[in-house]
Design a protein with these regions (language model features):
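Residue-identity detector for glutamine
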Residues: 3, 34-35, 98, 116
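Histidine-centered active-site loop/cap adjacent to the catalytic His
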Residues: 47, 68-130
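Substrate-gating cap/lid alpha-helix
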Residues: 18-59, 72-73, 77
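Mature extracytoplasmic or otherwise solvent-exposed domains
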Residues: 64-65
């Protein structure tokens, strides 16, 4: 990336973390994602943090990554090692009149590959700010 940035000084490059894969906090994916975050922070780089978006519902209260969430928003709610809940589906069901629910159930309802429409709406909103 450094060579590309040197070759194209007028271009803003966007770094991206890897999507969640259900391995949790102590595993390789999260460790590599943290390296990307640290590098971007230390070097004033633009970061599109897929993993962070996939880790939190819109309320931002629980970190589902530590509960072994994956990019489909499934996670282990009771610590038995099995994905048995879906934070995006739960949030949408609990917030039927929220703007994000309406967006997820209309515009994003059938165009979100291997994930939940809410997750895609959150990523789209983040991309808008880039």
């Amino acid at each position: 990336m450094a060579q590309l940035e040197a070759d194209y000084p007028g271009i803003r490059f966007v770094y991206v973390t890897g999507h969640l894969d259900g391995t949790g906090a102590a595993e390789n994916l999260n460790l590599r994602n943290q390296q990307i975050r640290d590098y971007c922070a230390a070097n004033n780089k633009t970061l599109f943090d897929f993993a962070d978006i996939e880790s939190y519902d819109p309320n931002g209260i629980s970190n589902y990554m530590v509960l072994k969430a994956d990019d489909h928003c499934d996670y282990d709610s009771n610590g038995d090692g099995s994905s048995d809940a879906n934070w995006a589906a739960n949030w949408v069901a609990a917030n039927p009149s929220q703007e994000l629910t309406i967006l997820a159930s209309t515009i994003c309802s059938d165009c979100c590959a291997h994930s939940q429409p809410l997750n895609c709406a959150l990523k789209g909103r983040a991309a808008w700010w880039l």
